[in-house]
Amino acid sequence: MDYNVSAGSETYRGFLMDNILHSDVGDIHFHLYIPESYDKSEPYALYLSLPGYEGLYFQGVGTNIRSEDFAFEAQKYNDKMIIAAPQLSDWGNTSAEQTIALTEYLLDAYAIDRGKVYINGYSGGGETLSLVLTKRPELFTAALHVASVWDGELAPLVQARTPVYFVIGESDEYYGSARISRTYEELCRLYRAEGLTEEEIGALAVLDVKDRAWFGGGNQHGGIGRVSQDETVMRWLFGR
């Protein structure tokens, strides 16, 4: 398939900035990190990081990776991984379709190990992630859903068996933790209805509600971003 891509001209901490995939669902702005060792002779892992509101494109080029560390911390877990940090335009269906289009482009354009395709979404990016995993859960090996809620459906996720790690502060100032806790409980119920054991469910769905002490008394919705430095969480994602 032919793709129309405008390459960026500036770099930031190893990322080629503001590439544009001109797609049927609009122009998709994204920053791209390709390890120097990549030469197409060996399939690499792929990771996409969906930003919160502060990282959307209208906030300015690069605000996503200047305010969130997921794309940089990920490099510590696999030195053979291509990383894309899209700057989306909203946290709804448009951004979900654009995330899927970008993923499909990257899978076609680069030598990617289809068994190592990861994604995370923080805040509004988590809402987008829930829609992505409703539409095309089979594209991804595992997902990290950070400080957000689930706007999508769960049945497609159950059918695809895509593992999801939900993490949020117990008193998240924007979303609270009750809604995503209910989502997790419903997801587990659906897996039980499919006949899965508790051990099997535990490998597919994790709920990690951080207490006040974890934040040191500070802001929880913004402070949750430091899970990008939490080895337990990140190894769960990239160990799949």
Regions found by a protein language model. Name each.
Residues 108-109, 115-159:
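Primarily recognizes the serine-hydrolase "nucleophile elbow" in alpha/beta-hydrolase
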Residues 1-46, 127, 131-132, 191-205, ...:
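A domain-start/cap signature at the N-terminus of enzymes
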Residues 42-43, 57-63, 96-97, 131-132, ...:
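Short, solvent-exposed loop/turn and secondary-structure capping segments
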Residues 165-167, 173-175, 181, 190-240:
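C-terminal catalytic histidine-bearing segment of alpha/beta-hydrolase fold enzymes
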Residues 79, 158-164:
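Short, proline-enriched alpha-helix->beta-strand connector loops that line the catalytic pocket
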Residues 44-100:
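Active-site machinery of serine-nucleophile hydrolases
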Residues 37-42, 91-123:
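Gly/Ser-rich "nucleophile elbow"/oxyanion-hole loop immediately N-terminal to the catalytic nucleophile
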Residues 52-56, 88-93, 123-127, 148-152, ...:
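Solvent-exposed loop/turn segments at secondary-structure junctions
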